Amino acid sequence: KLRRYIEEGERKEFHTGYKCSIREPWYLVPSVWVPDGFAFRQIYDFPRMVLNASGATSTDTIHRLRSKGVKPERVIANTYTWLTAASAEIEGRSYGGGVLELEPTEAERLMMPAKLNGAMPLTEVDQLVRAGRLDSVLEENARIVLRDHMGLSAADFSPIDQTPDLL
């Protein structure tokens, strides 16, 4: 069955396209692994990271995340802070129209708390973000993560929470 599928691709000349022509064999997709989560390359208002609860994989159209020794839910929940938002503005590339793009090395440099404690539960973050309440998540995580766990005062992070509006 697989052989017939490959032969059909060759009849349709899929193997002559650029992506397939540089592979050996042409039908083998490189670097396929199941990540813990995904980070979107192009962002508008905030660097979105999502948990890979379905066990899916992807090509290079979206960044794949691997959490090492830490629950991915904690990593992702802790990225929903003004610190990460400001970091994305500094690390990313702006292509105009409000779109910011993060290449792999830029995404790896995004700042987030070193101690992954106390952020809102990811299920709650997900519900609020889907309801269009990203600001509520950022405000609550600012209180929990930046103030309570990192020890910053409100004055310390108030310039950070305004950075996306300033840039």
Residue ranges and their predicted role:
Residues 1-127, 131, 137, 144-145:
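Polybasic, glycine- and aromatic-enriched phosphate-binding surface used to engage nucleic acids
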